[in-house]
Amino acid sequence: MKNIAFAVALTISAAAAALPQTSVAQGRSLPTFEVDKNWPKVPAGMKIGDVSSVAIDAQGNAWLLSRPRTLKGDDKAHAAPPITIFDPNGNYIRGWGGDGQGYQWPEREHGITIDYKGNVWLGGNSCPTNGLPGLRPVADDQLLKFTPDGKFLLQIGKSNQSKGNADTANLHRPADVQIDQQTDELFVADGYGNHRVAVFDANTGKFKRMWGAFGNKPLDADSCAVISYKEFKEPGPQQFSIVHAIRVSKDGMVYVADRENRRVQEFDRNGKFIKQLMKGDAIFARDLAFSPDQQFLYVGYNKGIAIVDPKTMEYLGQIQPPGILGAGHHIQTDQKGNIYIAQTGAGMQRLLFKGMK
């Protein structure tokens, strides 16, 4: 194997390989990182489409979810499968995914998660009227569950079947999921078409509960249009816009990234609103990831990653790698504290944890 570019060129300059800047909260040490310019190592001849999401398994392997339909020209003949797996050293292990019997693969891949049992969850965010090249006019209203080797286990919802936020049988363009190990519940950031958190039994797919921003009842809106607001002042709108990411902490708190409203909201497991952090000066809350000890919550912010105290929801500082982070879409951490960044349109990046400073 050797390093090659993704289908969309991934170039890292000497500056990008330097230590990313971390703003430091006064009197408190924060994590520092270094760009890993040799990760991942894509096999020669393999072309990977836009990488929309990344998940890390118990062995430290990185699972990339990409969009093969974004490849153009001759690259299509060398397309990698939608899921590609790389070991901690960046070496390619295997790949799988795509249409199959008994399930509906998403038209536009969006989010991937590995649960504590090793099962793989994924969904998409295609909209019938998005007009994107190479996509059929369908809505991704489903989530899929597989074993690590790609055996189909469960589908929640069906393509093109959503009846809106009150629908308990279908999702509507879900962006992200998280499994709560203590309750075996599936928390869904639902998402692009709906504007809610939806909770299901992770084994049976049975619907359990849902809520909107501040714990309100979620309301329907144009399911293919982004609800955007011109002003970003506390407390913000009473409804979610795009519910783009969700994380459940070890102590049972649920953190929700409300991307277009530029805020992260915290709830208990039953949807009781606790508090929020809003940053109106730039795009905020693209995605969420905990440090391994959950002392820090990393939040996609502008062209970097915000460091937040999940207990107080206080903004502590920012990780700002030079160069290539502008298209950061999803982030994840591994057991060593490294950060993985899926950059739609610009491949992947790994930041190596270098200690506290």
Per-range role (PLM):
Residues 64-67, 122-126, 180, 188-191, ...:
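Conserved beta-strand positions in repeat-built beta-propeller and related beta-rich domains
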Residues 52, 69-119, 125, 160-162:
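Blade-loop segments of beta-propeller domains
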Residues 80-84, 141-144, 195-199, 263-265, ...:
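A short loop-to-beta-strand structural motif that recurs across blades of beta-propeller domains
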Residues 45-58, 101-118, 128, 161-185, ...:
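Beta-rich, blade/repeat-based domains predominating
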Residues 325-357:
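Blade-level signature of beta-propeller repeat domains, shared across WD40, Kelch, NHL, RCC1
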Residues 37-79, 244:
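Beta-strand-rich domains and repeat architectures in extracellular enzymes and scaffolds
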Residues 26-47, 230:
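A short helix->beta-strand "capping" segment at the edge of beta-propeller domains
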Residues 87-91, 147-151, 201-204, 268-272, ...:
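Short loop/turn segments that connect beta-strands within beta-propeller blades
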